[in-house]
Structures are given as C-alpha cells and as structure tokens.
Swiss-Prot record:
SUPFAM superfamilies, A to Z: Nucleic acid-binding proteins (SSF50249)
UniProt cross-references to Pfam families, sorted A to Z: Ribosomal_S17
Record keywords: Ribonucleoprotein, Ribosomal protein, RNA-binding, rRNA-binding
Subunit-structure text: Part of the 30S ribosomal subunit.
One GO term describing the cellular component: cytosolic small ribosomal subunit
NCBIfam families: PRK05610.1 (NF004123), uS17_bact (TIGR03635)
Keyword Membrane attached: no
Family assignment from sequence similarity: Belongs to the universal ribosomal protein uS17 family.
One MF term in the entry's GO annotations: structural constituent of ribosome
Name the record gives this protein: Small ribosomal subunit protein uS17
Record has Transcription as a keyword: no
Any one GO BP annotation for this protein: translation
Length: 78
C-alpha cells in the first residue's frame, strides 16, 4: 500500500524538530454543487529544523514518531 503524500503550508514552527502543516482540500458538494475548502492540520517531523512559517512542504506518512506525529517532511521549497 503506497504512503500518502500531501502538499501544505507550515503554520507553526516553534517546537524542536516539529512543525504544524496546514493542508487544503478543495471539493465540490454533490447535492448543491458548491465548491468547499477544507483545511486540516498535521503535525510533522522536521529533522533538520529547516522549515519556517509560510514554507510550502510535502509531507509523507510515516510510522508513529510520537503520540501525534505520524508524518515526515519529504521536500521543502522555500
């Protein structure tokens, strides 16, 4: 089974080796045909502390690192 990969924006980078990434999902409601934006925040592991707030990053599923961290930063474009 392939690992999930999401693209998002770093919203919080204050903790050591941990960042909060906000991922946008856009979908259309089947009944009302309205476009809906849904944001979800993921806690991701940043090994090198290289990410800053506002950076675009790719996160990938990983085995649990801590209670809430189950994602790892794969690629960050500054």
């Amino acid at each position: 089974m392939p690992k999930k990969v999401f693209c998002g924006t770093v919203t919080k980078a204050k903790c050591d080796k941990t960042v909060k990434v906000s991922v946008l999902q856009v979908y259309k409601d089947e009944l009302y045909k309205k476009v809906i934006k849904k944001y979800k925040k993921y806690t991701a592991h940043d090994e090198n502390n290289s990410c800053k707030e506002g950076d675009k990053v790719l996160i990938q599923e990983h085995k649990p690192i801590s209670t809430t961290k189950k994602w790892v930063i794969v690629n960050s474009s500054h």
